[in-house]
């Protein structure tokens, strides 16, 4: 173990097996908090390699509680966070719209670590309880097309790293791992990342996991599709990886200034998202959520992004998403 630690401290990449062994130690609580802080910051400064991400992911998944296998296509839509953008919870909002469109969504959720508002924090403001049993989550999925898997419930070993992550208050390898650790092993996924450097490595990892189709997104330091800048896309489809760029006009919507999608605390984000789903929200945020939902719809074979966006907008303005939120809060 000392040899592995010295390699990290000296700026060398670990092999997949070295990373796996290291994170087995970490997730078993065998590394003290001072060492863990040094490891995470050293990896961050060096830049986490594909092999390091893969090894760490395998170690974390081995200790996770799996979610029952589904016999149909379903998706996650999730971001690494850590992009420092303070945008509203776009992925969570888009998951709710997608489910209202009839898609099956199993979203991996957590409270905020390196930002102001995580998916759990927003859902809590809507009185949606996601800290529920597997059976209850499955019932929610069956009845309402969506369920939310609360990360601490399925990844108990993360208790060994939570304090350090909160103290560091910066993105680390665990931000990268989050979207890869959904206990349901979704065949489809939209994954937002905070850096273009992560796009190809994550696509390679998803390919090794035999994912059916995945779309990885990045836009001007934000881990979502945005309408103020081009959005970089890396797509895994039929075991082939391609990269391309999308623009606001790709979705048939308007350009919007970055400052118009800013959020804040969970309470502030709740007020914004509530207005959107009541049909009274800012057009910039409404169209941004619709564009992200369009990507989600594309995963399920609906290839026309402009039609997808218009359909998502229709669903939002119908009030059906807000009605689904009310149903979820009663579950």
Swiss-Prot record:
Top enzyme class: transferase
List positions binding anthranilate 2.
165
Q: Which residues participate in 5-phospho-alpha-D-ribose 1-diphosphate binding?
A: 79, 82-83, 87, 89-92, 107-115, 119
Q: Pfam families of this UniProt entry?
A: Glycos_trans_3N, Glycos_transf_3
Q: What is its EC number?
A: 2.4.2.18
Gene Ontology cellular-component annotations:
cytosol
UniProt-recorded Gene Ontology molecular function terms: anthranilate phosphoribosyltransferase activity; magnesium ion binding
Q: Its catalytic activity?
A: N-(5-phospho-beta-D-ribosyl)anthranilate + diphosphate = 5-phospho-alpha-D-ribose 1-diphosphate + anthranilate
> Cofactor note, please?
Binds 2 magnesium ions per monomer.
Query: What interactions and quaternary structure are annotated?
Result: Homodimer.
Name under which the protein is recorded: Anthranilate phosphoribosyltransferase
């Amino acid at each position: 173990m000392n040899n592995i630690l010295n390699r990290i401290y000296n700026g060398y990449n670990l092999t997949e097996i070295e990373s796996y062994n290291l994170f087995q130690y970490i997730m078993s609580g065998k590394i003290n908090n001072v060492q863990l802080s040094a490891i995470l910051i050293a990896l961050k400064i060096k830049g986490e390699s594909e092999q390091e991400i893969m090894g760490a992911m395998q170690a974390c998944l081995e200790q996770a509680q799996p979610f029952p296998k589904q016999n149909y296509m379903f998706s996650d839509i999730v971001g690494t966070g850590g992009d420092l953008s303070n945008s509203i919870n776009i992925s969570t909002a888009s998951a709710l719209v997608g489910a209202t469109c009839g898609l099956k969504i199993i979203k991996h959720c957590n409270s905020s670590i390196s930002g102001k508002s995580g998916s759990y924090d927003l859902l809590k403001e809507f009185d949606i309880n996601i800290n529920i049993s597997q059976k209850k989550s499955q019932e929610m999925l069956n009845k309402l097309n969506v369920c939310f898997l609360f990360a601490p419930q399925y990844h108990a070993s993360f208790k060994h790293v939570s304090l350090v992550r909160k103290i560091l208050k910066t993105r680390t390898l665990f931000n990268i791992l989050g979207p890869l650790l959904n206990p349901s092993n979704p065949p489809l996924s939209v994954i937002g990342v905070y850096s273009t450097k992560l796009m190809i490595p994550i696509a390679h990892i998803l390919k090794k996991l035999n994912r059916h189709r995945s779309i990885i997104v990045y836009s001007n330091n934000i881990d979502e599709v945005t309408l103020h800048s081009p959005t970089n896309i890396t797509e895994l489809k039929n075991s082939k990886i391609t990269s391309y760029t999308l623009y606001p006009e790709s979705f048939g919507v308007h350009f919007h200034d970055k400052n118009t999608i800013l959020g804040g605390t969970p309470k502030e984000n709740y007020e914004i998202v509530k207005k959107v789903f009541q049909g009274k929200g800012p057009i910039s945020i409404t169209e941004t959520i619709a564009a992200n939902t369009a990507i989600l719809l594309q995963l399920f074979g609906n290839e026309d992004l402009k039609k997808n966006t218009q359909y998502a907008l229709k669903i939002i303005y119908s009030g059906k998403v807000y009605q689904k939120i009310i149903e979820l809060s009663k579950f």
